[in-house]
Design a protein with these regions (language model features):
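Multi-pass membrane glycosyltransferase architecture that uses lipid-linked
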Residues: 1-219, 264-423
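Extracytoplasmic catalytic-loop and juxtamembrane helix elements of membrane-embedded
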Residues: 3-12, 43, 207-239, 243, ...
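Juxtamembrane membrane-water interface segments that cap and precede transmembrane helices
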Residues: 65-75, 244-262
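Helicase-core coupling region on the C-terminal RecA-like lobe
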Residues: 224, 249-277
């Protein structure tokens, strides 16, 4: 719609020339990549040129809500109204943390937001899905499972990343009682069915509004290169100092990098993230980690595993970190360092993108990895290694033990020999 085009025009912080860069026609859909011919079919059979068929180019259907609310003001004041809206969301999260976790947690959130989200906190809408992930966590801790699943479903259709939190929520729900397995599975059925129905309804709504942009969102996730702030891009930058030239270029609304080691870097980071996910979920399953710890670990995993790690992605972590991170020790200092480095790289050093500032991003990403390693129950791997080694040793000893038992049963016993010697 024309109103949403105005929104995109004035939201200069989100992406410049959004409509010019992303407005789609049939030819663009055909050239944007195919999903088994789906793109070509959509381009040939769907006409989305009418009103009320506009979706955010990178975000799911519920993102229309926070972007549409400030439309009550004149277009010239949209940016101010949007900033006020996000400020109210931030204050709401502060109050929620103060109510549920205390003033120290709320203060830690406020300090980290002031430093780490200096340029993105009220210019992006990431506070809204981050708030829903916090609400879902608090509902899960109170065992209000159906509402927790629905909060995550709403967050997922605001910005796709909360979908990964379905796994720790499912595990926590399954381990919430000591009832027999059948009763646990039966208790899961209703909340999961309600969540699946909500997701299916929102997905259908997306397809009805504009299947062309919905297809383009999926194609973008699959095709986009490594964004310069991502963890794989840091490995590419390090590889450039080892003889693998790095190429910088723009596209998909971001600055990107590429080199011969880019696929290997993405694979290595993906494997590290997978190990982190397994460790976090196993720790939650065996009750060696709390649900907030596993929640934060999974969120950190998705940030380091992705092709993009924009400055506003730090907002995803901060409400949950306020619940988990103690106010004493080194952990809060490392969090503050990560926030400072994030703001130092954007916006202050953003114009020096090709001037060598990648080292600041490398330090930020390293601090996030250190925080993730500190959060994970790494002793799980030590226990697993000891258990596997014990089984290996037991199997090696078992044949000799069986032979000795057979000899003892076949031959005369020691008492029998002594009786024979007496006679």
């Amino acid at each position: 719609s024309q109103a949403m085009k105005t929104v995109d025009a004035v939201r200069h912080g989100q992406c410049t020339d959004v409509q010019q860069a992303y407005e789609l026609d049939s030819a663009q859909v055909r050239s944007s990549g195919r999903l088994h011919g789906l793109g070509a079919w959509i381009a040939d059979h769907v006409d989305m040129s009418g009103r009320f068929h506009s979706l955010p180019i990178e975000y799911p259907v519920l993102a229309l809500v926070p972007f549409s609310l400030p439309l009550v003001v004149p277009p010239a004041d949209y940016t101010v109204a949007f900033g006020i809206e996000m400020t109210l969301v931030a204050l709401g999260l502060f109050a929620l943390l103060a109510w549920r976790a205390g003033w120290r947690a709320a203060g830690f959130f406020a300090v980290c937001m002031s430093i780490g989200a200096y340029a993105t906190g009220i210019e992006r809408f990431d506070l809204v899905p981050a708030g829903l992930t916090l609400v879902a966590l608090l509902l899960a801790e109170r065992k209000q499972w159906t509402w927790a699943y629905l909060a995550l479903a709403a967050g997922t259709f605001l910005k796709y990343y909360p979908i990964v939190l379905m796994l720790p929520l499912f595990v926590a729900h399954l381990r919430s009682t000591e009832a027999p397995v059948r009763e646990r599975v039966r208790a899961l059925a209703r909340p999961v069915a309600v969540c699946a129905a909500a997701c299916a309804g929102l997905l259908l709504l997306s397809l009805l509004i504009n299947p062309v942009i919905f297809y383009r969102q999926i194609a973008t996730l699959m095709q986009r290169p490594l964004e310069v702030e991502s963890v794989p891009a840091t490995l590419v930058w390090l590889g450039s100092h080892a003889g693998f030239p790095m190429r910088s270029f723009g596209g998909f609304g971001s600055d990107n990098v590429d080199s011969a080691v880019a696929p290997a870097a993405a694979l290595v980071v993906g494997l590290i993230a997978l190990l982190a996910l397994i460790t976090a979920i196993s720790g939650l399953w065996f009750r060696r980690s709390t649900l907030p710890q596993a929640w934060l670990a999974v969120l950190m995993m998705i940030t380091i595993a992705g092709k993009v790690f924009s400055a506003q992605y730090l907002i995803w972590l901060l409400p949950i970190a306020a619940l988990v991170v103690p106010v004493e020790g080194l952990a809060p200092l490392v969090w503050l360092a990560a926030c400072t480095l994030t703001t130092f790289s954007f916006p202050f050093l953003w114009r020096a993108l090709h001037g060598g500032w990648h080292g600041v991003i490398a330090l930020r990403n390293a601090s996030i990895l250190v925080l993730l390693a500190n959060l994970l129950p790494l002793e799980e791997w030590a226990r697993w290694r000891q258990a596997v080694w014990a089984k290996v040793v037991e199997r090696r000893r078992r044949p000799a033990g069986r032979a000795g038992v057979q000899w003892a049963t076949q031959g005369p016993s020691q008492s029998t020999l002594s009786e024979l010697s007496d006679t």
